[in-house]
Amino acid sequence: MLPSHLNGHSPLARRCPRLSAASPPATGDSDAAAAAADAPLAEHDRIYFQSYSHIGIHEAMIKDRVRTDAYRSAIMHHQKFIEGKVVMDVGCGTGILSVFCARAGAKCVYAVEASEMATQAREIVKANNLDDKVVVVHGRVEDVEVEDKVDVIISEWMGYMLLYESMLPSVLFARDKWLKPGGLILPSHATLFMAPITNSERYEGSVDFWSDVYGINMSALVPLAKKFTSEEPSIEIIGGENVLSWPFVVKHIDCYTFKAEELKSFTTKYKVSSMMLAPIHGFGLWFEVEFNGPSNPTDKSPSDLNPLDVIRKKRRRGSEDPVVLSTAPEDEPTHWHQTILYFPDPIEVKQDQIIEGSVKVSQSEENPRFLNIQLDCTTGGQTLVKDYAMR
């Protein structure tokens, strides 16, 4: 578990495994399942899956009612596509989503889990009298060889700032190998948002604090505090009042068509205007996922929409609209919080002042589950170029 600079959360202490499915074996200990579980792992995968063997991560995820209720609502919303069908749960963890799907009438659910939590998932399935419907497969989705096609793929693959931990490629692998034409993917779409933020309380508490400690001048520590604060992305909760402009779209993902290669590196340019007079302390990132069918070719992606239209659409959703899970600052907090890229020094902006630049997100060469972020920001004649490593 790696330390987070600002709040003690380890980014790696979060997400879930990569997986695979198979036709229901006669027993939970089939040769295919054993082979998948024993397949050699890269060191970064071994550490990653080992972290998901600890109950604490699963407790945090399941206790996140925004997350868990959104998935349960999405399953019931799409019950007619699940009832009597074959479902694959990629990275099932404790098996809670698999149980939801089985209770929604799925004929068979392949619950694929690469960590040792698969053992407990199998016991949970049995304790709920669903072992005739839910087959727990212990192994990575990339390592299981099966002939069956599935009607639905469900997965809770999102990491901090959506893409940290890089589990999405496993879902796309399952899609390409096992999803039937016209099948359903839950969630279906994901959008990563970003906006400049102000957070004087946070900055003063971590940096300015050192100027006077119990009457002792410790300002010699201020440069170190600035470096420490802006070295890595911070996982913390901010509110809508901290956001200085309308958000812009960093990346939109259609899970029906997206290619894993697109995650290796991408750059987004932005140009926003400040809604108030305030210091910019950095940029915040958050995401939302939507549980829907394939996109209509005529549909606009979020990058084509005015941010105000995106927010208004979210606020007026009716019972027939797709279920949306949002981690935005103005919405109820989740265990994902928001991801903050702090500046070493704040930049003062006036109302309506233009803030522009680019953000580049790329997978780390040392570990594809890690992210490198390069931020370029220009406003009021000042330019900041800063690299962040999300380890």
Curated annotation (Swiss-Prot):
Residues 45-391 form the SAM-dependent MTase PRMT-type domain. Keywords: Methyltransferase, S-adenosyl-L-methionine, Transferase. It holds the Pfam family PRMT_C. Residues 1-35 are annotated as: Disordered. Its EC number is 2.1.1.-. InterPro entries: Arg_MeTrfase, Methyltransf_25, PRMT_dom, SAM-dependent_MTases_sf. The keyword ATP-binding does not apply. The keyword Amino-acid biosynthesis does not apply. GO terms for molecular function: histone methyltransferase activity; protein-arginine N-methyltransferase activity. Residues 20-35 have a biased composition (Low complexity). Coiled coil: none annotated. S-adenosyl-L-methionine binds at residues 58, 67, 91, 113, 142. The active site is at residues 156, 165. It comes from the Eukaryota. GO terms for biological process: chromatin remodeling; methylation; regulation of DNA-templated transcription. Arginine methyltransferase that can both catalyze the formation of omega-N monomethylarginine (MMA) and asymmetrical dimethylarginine (aDMA). Belongs to the class I-like SAM-binding methyltransferase superfamily. Protein arginine N-methyltransferase family. PRMT6 subfamily. This is Probable protein arginine N-methyltransferase 6.1. It comes from Oryza sativa subsp. japonica (Rice). The gene is PRMT6.1.
